[in-house]
Amino acid sequence: IDGFHDNMAVRTLKAIGAKNVTTLFDNGFGAQGDVDMKFSEIKEKVKKLLCDDTIFTVGDENKKIKKVAMINGAGGDDECFSRAREVGADLYISGEFKHHILLEAKETNYALMSVGHYASEMCFNDVLNDILKCHFDIIKIVKYYEGNPFNG
């Protein structure tokens, strides 16, 4: 699901208005896209899209963002953070971050957004649904949303 050309991160970035959205890694993992918004505007769009008020940020929320990168779920490790910076992203969004990544971002005034692991994968069912429909002509798909364990 993560290594799919229309993965969860690609869909999320498109939904907040990013243009020229492509995968972050060559294997189809993550996403990157162009925006022209303040960090705070992106935060509000993501908050509304994911129905999650528990978004945490690092960096100046008045900063103008031109390029955003995202990996849903637990993408806050060294490899993913380095890749976001390597492609020139001004903002990196994920569901979880390692503590030392947060500290590095704070020290360098790099913009990070932590949206929560569950919230970042809200569109999983839709992506899986689309993949299955591409491969099976006759299939009935039943979707089930269990809810965020942190918020009830």
Question: Which residue ranges define each predicted feature?
Answer:
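Active-site catalytic microenvironments in core metabolic enzymes, especially phosphate/sugar-handling
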Residues: 1-152
